[in-house]
């Protein structure tokens, strides 16, 4: 019998960084507020112990250790930054809750309070994400893009110390650790589409733990789930990993139908880019939130028709484990085949 049924504290697995523990802490606090005792358990991951770029150390490096502990039963649930999860399904687990999302936009933190358009040509801007690198280069500002790893504090320090003129990071991370005051510009999606699922958390547990799945469902936000499902379906259909130069942002918005009634629609924007910024393909779609996964796949197919595969194949070929023994790029599968009870598997 699981902790959810016995009343013993639920053990929440998390990485040990300030950001990860703050994120997991919001889940712990929500469970405690609902009358379910919970505590954090810190798990070391290979990603925390490596200074290599994420695209070199591999997809899932921040989540595999948490899943190992979850499978072993040493924790009852794990809290992930959803964008770090591989799209490949794992039938042992289920995403039982996706809490309300933080602002998914990227943020610029620059010296002297500068915004992106005020940075001089040759300014050193730190980021290692190919998606950000590609979109920054595509703006044609002549910036010098510098590789960047480390926790948020160490990234910000490289600007304060004068080593870099600016860094680009997820706004959600700064918000969660109370550092939004350092943001000099929130980058609008028209400038830079965020990573699929950026700003969203995934609360994962074992698929056979029915009582815990039911308990965690109370934390689920339907609009966030629909948006994340659409964005990750697009990523999976493009056969791209979480480090590929792919951006996506979905939002549930209200509109009027033909009879003047207010209805909810899912608006999804996506892009695929060449890492050198020479080309960025963009497309968008609007549809029923209940068809979120289908909309994501449809938009991905539109991007593929525009030439996205040719832009992404070079990046896919360099990711660890990206090639099969035949030399062909191995397509990852979408995790939507293992939905929670609240997720539309279409």
Curated annotation (Swiss-Prot):
The keyword Transport does not apply. Residues 317-346 are annotated as: Disordered. GO terms for biological process: protoporphyrinogen IX biosynthetic process. Its cofactor is dipyrromethane. SUPFAM superfamilies: Periplasmic binding protein-like II (SSF53850), Porphobilinogen deaminase (hydroxymethylbilane synthase), C-terminal domain (SSF54782). Pathway: Porphyrin-containing compound metabolism; protoporphyrin-IX biosynthesis; coproporphyrinogen-III from 5-aminolevulinate: step 2/4. The modification S-(dipyrrolylmethanemethyl)cysteine is found at residue 242. It catalyses: 4 porphobilinogen + H2O = hydroxymethylbilane + 4 NH4(+). Binds 1 dipyrromethane group covalently. Keywords: Porphyrin biosynthesis, Transferase. Its EC number is 2.5.1.61. InterPro entries: HemC (IPR000860), Porphobilin_deaminase_cofac_BS (IPR022419), Porphobilin_deaminase_N (IPR022417), Porphobilinogen_deaminase_C (IPR022418), Porphobilinogen_deaminase_C_sf (IPR036803). Belongs to the HMBS family. PANTHER family: PORPHOBILINOGEN DEAMINASE (PTHR11557:SF0). Tetrapolymerization of the monopyrrole PBG into the hydroxymethylbilane pre-uroporphyrinogen in several discrete steps. This is Porphobilinogen deaminase. It comes from Nocardia farcinica (strain IFM 10152). The gene is hemC.
């Amino acid at each position: 019998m699981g902790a959810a049924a016995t009343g013993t504290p639920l053990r929440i697995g998390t990485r040990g960084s300030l950001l990860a523990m703050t994120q997991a802490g919001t889940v712990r606090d929500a469970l405690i507020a609902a009358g379910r005792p919970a505590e954090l358990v810190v798990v070391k991951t290979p990603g925390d112990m490596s200074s290599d770029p994420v695209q070199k150390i591999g997809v899932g490096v921040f989540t595999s250790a948490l899943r190992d502990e979850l499978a072993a039963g040493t924790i009852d649930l794990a809290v992930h930054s959803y964008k770090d999860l591989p799209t490949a399904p794992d039938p042992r687990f289920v995403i039982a809750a996706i809490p309300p999302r933080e602002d998914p936009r990227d943020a610029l933190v620059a010296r002297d309070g500068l915004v992106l358009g005020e940075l001089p040509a040759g300014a050193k801007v730190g980021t290692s994400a190919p998606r950000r690198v590609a979109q920054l280069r595509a703006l044609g500002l002549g910036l010098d893009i510098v590789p960047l790893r480390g926790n948020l504090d160490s990234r910000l320090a490289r600007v304060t110390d004068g080593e870099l003129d600016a860094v680009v990071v997820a706004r959600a991370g700064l918000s969660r650790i109370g550092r939004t005051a350092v943001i000099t510009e929130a980058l609008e999606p028209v400038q830079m589409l965020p990573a699929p699922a950026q700003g969203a958390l995934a609360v994962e547990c074992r698929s056979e733990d029915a009582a815990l799945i039911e308990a965690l469902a109370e934390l689920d936000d339907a609009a966030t789930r629909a948006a994340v499902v659409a964005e990750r379906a697009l990523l999976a259909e493009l056969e791209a990993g979480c480090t590929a130069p792919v951006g996506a942002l979905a939002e549930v918005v209200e509109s009027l139908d033909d009879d003047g009634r207010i209805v909810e629609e899912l608006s999804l924007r996506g892009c695929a880019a060449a890492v050198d910024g020479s080309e960025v393909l963009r497309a968008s779609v609007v549809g029923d939130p209940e068809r979120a996964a289908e909309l994501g796949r449809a938009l991905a197919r539109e991007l593929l028709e525009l030439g996205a595969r040719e832009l992404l194949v070079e990046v896919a070929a360099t990711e660890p484990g990206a090639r099969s023994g035949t030399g062909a790029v191995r397509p990852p599968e979408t995790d939507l085949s293992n939905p929670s009870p609240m997720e539309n598997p279409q």
